[in-house]
Amino acid sequence: MPPILILLTLLLPLRAGAEEIIGGHEVKPHSRPYMARVRFVKDNGKRHSCGGFLVQDYFVLTAAHCTGSSMRVILGAHNIRAKEETQQIIPVAKAIPHPAYDDKDNTSDIMLLKLESKAKRTKAVRPLKLPRPNARVKPGHVCSVAGWGRTSINATQRSSCLREAQLIIQKDKECKKYFYKYFKTMQICAGDPKKIQSTYSGDSGGPLVCNNKAYGVLTYGLNRTIGPGVFTKVVHYLPWISRNMKLL
């Protein structure tokens, strides 16, 4: 790996909305019906937003660092700035971050949101399937990540419309070179350092979709350069997800 890449692989300070879609393309409206926009207010009074995805009629999965007060979820959106008839805006009844979440090393950065009311299934609103226990995607497999992020690093505004980029699953040893706090049992690393098409700021909590299933939850990426993003490995947390959805 070129030395300059090594110098630039500093972790972004984790803040709400810390990851975004760079490059990629706008998707066909409502073709990713599982996508959610999570909005909330931080302790400093500022409004923030993250990505997320519907996994059951009452539950959305997102990143644990995407939390605050006045939480609500927008489902069925394509143009997030427009008042679309397909949109369902539902307050969050309860936020359940993983109890082992550590904001210092970004492990267990996963959270369930229980909605106050049941999501109405339509062509624009559908849950995303989770993988089976012990399922895995091999390095080299092409997956996708979607969100309402900036279209370039220098852009000052995020995209109004949902965009998607294709990412390549990286080898664990390569991920360790980029991220010294990378834990292969709990995380997946995906991207392509050679292409301007990766994750950056604004869509933390969005899904890494492989074979039409959610294999990861976006947690963080690289600072000052485009490269792989790190995702919380959904398979590792399936027992916790299942247990909490049954209890609530």
Curated annotation (Swiss-Prot):
Residues 1-18 form the signal peptide. It holds the Pfam family Trypsin. The active site is at H65 (charge relay system), D109 (charge relay system), S204 (charge relay system). Residues 21-246 form the Peptidase S1 domain. This enzyme is probably necessary for target cell lysis in cell-mediated immune responses. Belongs to the peptidase S1 family. Granzyme subfamily. This is Granzyme F. It comes from Mus musculus.
